[in-house]
Amino acid sequence: MNKFLEKVGVSIASRIGITAAIALIAAAVLGGGYWYVTSRAPRETVKSAESGTKVDVEEMAFYGTGSLRVSGKVYRPANTLDEKRPAVIYCQDTSYGESWCRELAGAGIIAYCFDFQGDGEKARTRELETVLKGIRNLRHADKDRVFLLGEANGCLTAATVAFANPKQVQGLILVSPGFNPLEISRKAKRYKGTVLIVDDALGRKANLEEIRGFVY
């Protein structure tokens, strides 16, 4: 069993214990595939450019069915692991997402960004759904306040996943979408969440205030 745990991710066993790790993997397998989270110490602490608030940054990977592995970084207000907070998943390359996530965390929000690995919308959708499941299960994330933030080309993937998972995604944030969101929203009859369209031309400070009001 130790060799199996080492193969699928020994870090989870070291963080929560062998027995808990076995139980988590078994439960997930029975549910149609397993996922788990890995973290690499040490955590990095940075400051929000807008608020000056300290932000903890930690590498985190989510695993889905088969060989799917999605790697990224989670940003949260420093020293707030015991507090439930809304979470935003950024959908676009991390080169853009890291600054967004740092400022979102500075505004009191848990934020996660990652690089899509697969080609095509189907692969990107699968990766984002894996991240969504993982973020909803973080102990410091409020699973009833999870939002997807898409920017530019990432808007389509964010909208697709939000509309396909209406009970898991409480709201959709679109920054400079490359399509008319009304065209997609007409097809999203089951989606009960709200949609916020952000005009990036207004500036980051105004955008952050609008997003914070939206998720809180």
Which residues fall in each region the model found?
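N-terminal Sec-pathway targeting helices
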Residues: 4-24
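N-terminal cap/lid segment of alpha/beta-hydrolase-fold proteins
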Residues: 41-81
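Conserved alpha/beta-hydrolase
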Residues: 107-120
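Alpha/beta-hydrolase active-site loop
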Residues: 120-139
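The feature captures the conserved acid-bearing segment of alpha/beta-hydrolase catalytic domains
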Residues: 171, 176-209
